[in-house]
Amino acid sequence: MSALSASLAAAAAAARASETSRESNNVAVTKARPPQHTLVKPAPAKPPRPVARRPKQPVKITVDTSVANTPAPQGSSATSAAAAAARHFKKQKDEQSSPKLSPHHRPPASHRNSGESAKTPSSDSRPASTTSTIPVTPVSATTPSSTVAAAASAAAKRSSTFNKSVPTPVVSDIMKKEQEENRAAAAAAAAQEKATQIIRDLPSPSNSVRSKRLSQSSLVPVLSDEDIYNHRRYARSSQSFATIPTDEDSPGEMGDFEDNNQVHRERARGIQSAAKHANRLSQTSMDSTHTSQQLQPVVSPHTGLPQEGSVLAAALKAGSNASSTMERISLTNEAKEREKAEKRQRKDAKAKAKLLAQANAVYQQSTNESHHAHHHQYHQGNIFKRVIGKSGKPIDPFQGFSPNFSERPGEHFHNHQREMQGAPDGIRRSMDTSRQSIDAPRQSLDAARQSIDTPRELTTNDTSPIPIQPLKSHDAGAVSDLPTSLDEPGLSGHPHLQQSFSNNNALQTVKSSTDDSMSIASLDSVDDSGPGRPPLLAPIPIRNASIIPVSSESESEDIRRGHRRHLSSSQSQRNSLQFPMSPTFSASPAKQLITPEQLLPKRRRGIARTPSVSSSAPRSSSPVISIPLERSSTLQSTLQGSPMNSPVAKSPVFFEGNNGSTNGGLGSSMSNSPPDSELALTPSESTAHSYFAREYREPKSSSTRGVEGASRLAKKLPHRHLAAGGKSIVKSIWNKATPDAPPPPPVSTGGMKTSLRKQPKKKFNEDKPWKHHNDADTLTDADRKRYDGVWATNRGAHVPYYMEPEEYDILIDEEEFYDEGFLSDSDFTDSDSDDDSVSSAEYIMSGENIGNDDVVVSDQNDAVHGYIVSRLWRRSRLPDERLSDIWELVDRCNDGTLDREGFLVGMWLVDQCLYGRKLPNKVDPRVWGSVGRLNVNIKIRQKEPKRNSAKRKARRKVRRDRKELVRERERNEKERRKDEKKEKKDEKKDKKDDRRRDKKRVGEA
């Protein structure tokens, strides 16, 4: 009984020790009653996170029955039993103090990284002497102390009941292993499920973005073969990878990969290594009893959010970064795709436009000439230019071009545009409708022409409504018989003529297909309220005339350029645009009449005409017919239409500027007219551009300012220098500055010079043209070419109607001679003509500006009408007195016209006046030479006699003699060397002949 009681006492002491050790983090601390057997308690460390210590092997709680069966020694039987139990426990502890771990039982990486290890009390801390001590029996951490106490008490009862030795019940090793296996399996299954769910929920980051490392944690995913297969399949479908641990020490990091196959291989390799690592850790945790305590909670129980440092928080953080990167990449890809789609659409649009252009070209060739001509007449612009709308359908070619014969712009083509844009099937029907709307007024105009031409052929010159032959004389009766308005009897019997008068669509520009010269066919309808009505201007007899539409200012420059390209595309298209209403001219000019609609200018809507200053009566709305101009010595009688009893003045009347006179005539009515509102002096196709048409534009709004006020303003404003290539010549007076808003004065920089060095010469200052004197007295090549373009555009217009029919026939014959190349002066004169008739190529002695020995040939084909000259020059806004002075300087024909040289020099003088220079008293001959057709300047420089010429000649002779002696010596030396060489050669030849003879003799012997 004593042995049994000692064992029970030892078991109770062990139970108390286990309870005490569990309260201090499961560290076994022995409570030895003697001081030498007390276990040293290690100092508690402060780990950064829960650390899993390596558990001890469970100790079997057994009671040595052999001690009880053996007879107790004398003395203290309890002491001997306790000593035996202590020795047995020490032996087992020594075996456990140095365990041999297998590779599978390697501690996890978190234990090594944290730098902490499981500190167990070693046997060295315990004294060797165990006598007189009661050993503390170790109990498993998982075995409750109450179970051991209950087992001990039950054994004591049974032993006391049966009065015999009964072995103490022991907790079986199989039971403990089963409990540990179940607990470890549950923890591993939960960890595997959570890790698999996290990896599947991870977003797929882009290949170009590095994923952030997942934070180190003890929660490592345990992946099976099925999970690895599913994850690999997910990686293939998404073509991306997830960041997973690739090494047991640190998580792996996938970088940038260009090949998707390489990405798949790396991901599969990382998943396999992670699975191996997780399996090793799980195998170790199977034997651990602290696994469930050291697992971090994934979700915080307080906030419901992912716990910091957990795998889920790191995964969510990496997923958010990856998702934002994916959004940016997707937006960039969408922008690139959108840009590619836009480029593709533009390319398709260009291809469609090219196909439409080809179709339009075929359509142009297939359409008849009248259809094309009326298209150009009623739609001033490139009507064949089609554009592609937003829907990819062709827009109506007439869109943007309002027909002139309608009151509302575009009224006839609204339905046509709807059909073109709405339904492609109605294109042919809409084009037929528009063609009918165009052909209807054309047929009415043709009928009007026929009705007008029929009575003209049947009636004589006395009954003709617009006679030409009786208008040769300028008596009052001839002028009074002319119909000047629609209410007069001359036009009352012709309704078609009245309709033509009311129609403002006139043929503006006519171009001859046999000559590059352009002419003016429409002139301003001037005020007819005054007593002195302007004369009628007869048509221009140009053979093979073809229409060229003149673009208005409202059209854009792109339309003008496109129209110019269209007209210059091919000669066949140019010839196909013959105007059906152009007059057919016979040999006799008396029958060459023109319809009034071709003479009357076209008024532009929205621009008010400036009223005349001298005319007090209101302007009449009815147009005025002009009469043909007669050839005379001056331009005064021909332009005013007054009787011939007026004194002959040298300067034309339209340059006098008498705005206050009652009988102002053409000068008073035209003094304040807009410069280029009606006259279209610039053709769309010709390379010769109008000089003043672009530079001196008319004001945007109507005003009552006179030309003199504008001229005074022009004197004060700065001007621009002539630029090469036909660019801007003078600053626009009406657009740049007005009297209401004068230009600001130049701002002076002031201050002292920063350097005393001489500054380099600057370029030409266009605000101070008087400081530039180079080439100021002659025309430059650029100026001459520019003025030649204006002259070629307007030469020969209205000039033949100065002559009588016989003179006109002579002019036609001479023009044929020009075409055939007969340019002899004898062909220009006509000996059979009367003395009164003047040939178109008349020898005229020059005026005071040219020497008496010079002869100028006046060719009417090259002359420019004085009326056109006045319209051109008045666009410069110079005073009429100044323009009259320029006319007197350049007028060499004295017949109301200017020849080529006079016109070019006059334009140059107008430009010089705009620069601020004064007019010369007479034109320098060098200026006339610079505008000649054969402008070849040969400069002959005469050498002046120099001093000491005799000495220089003597020295020159000595030098020549010395050189001659040296040359002689060189020649002699060369001859001597040559002779020596010849002698040596002869000697060698003689020796060779001698040897040959000797050999021959020896052979014969």
From Swiss-Prot:
Belongs to the IRS4 family. Residues 1-170, 183-219, 239-258, 272-350, 402-587, 602-624, 657-682, 735-776, 942-1005 are annotated as: Disordered. Keywords: Lipid metabolism. GO terms for cellular component: cytoplasm; plasma membrane. Gene3D superfamilies: EF-hand. Residues 246-258 have a biased composition (Acidic residues). It comes from Yarrowia lipolytica (strain CLIB 122 / E 150). One of its GO terms (biological process) is endocytosis. SUPFAM superfamilies: EF-hand. Residues 408-419, 763-776, 961-1005 have a biased composition (Basic and acidic residues). Residues 845-934 form the EH domain. This is Increased rDNA silencing protein 4. Positive regulator of phosphatidylinositol 4,5-bisphosphate turnover and negatively regulates signaling through the cell integrity pathway. Involved in rDNA silencing. Residues 1-18, 76-86, 127-161, 568-578, 608-624 have a biased composition (Low complexity). Pfam families: EH (PF12763). The lineage of its organism: Eukaryota, Fungi, Dikarya, Ascomycota, Saccharomycotina. Residues 948-960 have a biased composition (Basic residues). Residues 63-75, 111-126, 204-219, 280-297, 320-333, 451-466, 497-522 have a biased composition (Polar residues).
